[in-house]
């Protein structure tokens, strides 16, 4: 029998050593024991996979950029090598995302009861995130399918969070942040992105007195990120409009 506490201890140790693949493997084993995760365990799982997938997302962006430059040069051999390497990274990224999505569907979301709103929103947000990461590298019909799955998960989480969580709750705010990024970057829908981010920010500002002391730092940091994105996105839109003359 695997000792759950030992696995969690190993994940904590791996985090300190910045060995995120080990950390993810340990938390995957904890999840597969099929018992509800504590808040700390939930966060360990999230941090582990965020770093594992984050390394691949970053590599993919670098190689994609090199691929575009190489295509312009017209060196066939080099183009082929870069393309093959991008596809290798893509496969790794897809495997990590699939791993997380399987854990979410087979254990984590499945085991949330009707009153565990915070956990349900946390896991549905995670589901939206990992389908969004798949959408970043997917094309054609596959891209359309993962976008649909991402939006469905984000939307379900959003509805639950509005009904059952304070506007200042860091998980509700984090969801609004990522959902709005999904609209802006994946759906290419800046107006929806801005509306979602602005509503979340304004609702939180209106209820600042409900800010929990424990999560004060987390909540205010996410509010700052929402505001930063809004500033960036609205200036982008103004630039676009300015460049197009007086179009409605």
Curated annotation (Swiss-Prot):
Induction: Repressed under stress conditions such as netting.
Tissue-by-tissue expression: Expressed in brain, gill, heart, intestine, kidney, liver, ovary, skeletal muscle, spleen and testis.
InterPro entries reported in the protein's UniProt record: 14-3-3 (IPR000308), 14-3-3_CS (IPR023409), 14-3-3_dom_sf (IPR036815), 14-3-3_domain (IPR023410)
Protein location: Cytoplasm
Keywords: Cytoplasm
Gene Ontology CC terms: cytoplasm
Highest taxon above the source species: Eukaryota
Record-annotated site: Interaction with phosphoserine on interacting protein: 57, 132
Gene3D superfamilies on file: 14-3-3 domain (1.20.190.20)
Pfam family, one: 14-3-3
Principal localisation: cytoplasm
SMART domains attached to this UniProt entry: 14_3_3
Annotated family: Belongs to the 14-3-3 family.
PANTHER family per the UniProt record, alphabetical: 14-3-3 PROTEIN
Subunit record text: Homodimer, and heterodimer with other family members.
Protein function: Adapter protein implicated in the regulation of a large spectrum of both general and specialized signaling pathways. Binds to a large number of partners, usually by recognition of a phosphoserine or phosphothreonine motif. Binding generally results in the modulation of the activity of the binding partner.
Protein name: 14-3-3 protein gamma-2
Taxonomic source organism: Oncorhynchus mykiss (Rainbow trout)
């Amino acid at each position: 029998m695997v000792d759950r506490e030992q696995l969690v201890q190993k994940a904590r140790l791996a985090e300190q050593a910045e060995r995120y693949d080990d950390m993810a493997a340990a938390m995957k084993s904890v999840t597969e024991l099929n018992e509800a995760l504590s808040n700390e365990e939930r966060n360990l799982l999230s941090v582990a996979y965020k770093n594992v997938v984050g390394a691949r997302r970053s590599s993919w962006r670098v190689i994609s950029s090199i691929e575009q430059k190489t295509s312009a040069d017209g060196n066939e051999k080099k183009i082929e090598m870069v393309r093959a390497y991008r596809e290798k990274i893509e496969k790794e990224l897809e495997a990590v995302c699939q791993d997380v999505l399987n854990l979410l569907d087979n254990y984590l979301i499945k085991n949330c009861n009707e009153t565990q709103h915070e956990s349900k929103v946390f896991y549905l947000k995670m589901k939206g995130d990992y389908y969004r990461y798949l959408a970043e590298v997917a094309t054609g019909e596959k891209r359309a399918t993962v976008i649909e799955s991402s939006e469905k998960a984000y939307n379900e989480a959003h509805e639950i969070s509005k009904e059952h969580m304070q506007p200042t709750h860091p998980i509700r705010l984090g969801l609004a942040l990522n959902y709005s990024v999904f609209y802006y970057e994946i759906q290419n829908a800046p107006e929806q992105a801005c509306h979602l981010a602005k509503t979340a920010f304004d609702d939180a500002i209106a209820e600042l007195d409900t800010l929990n002391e424990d999560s004060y730092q987390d909540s205010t940091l996410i509010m700052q990120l929402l505001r930063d994105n809004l500033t960036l996105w609205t200036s982008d839109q103004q630039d676009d409009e300015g460049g197009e003359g007086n179009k409605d």
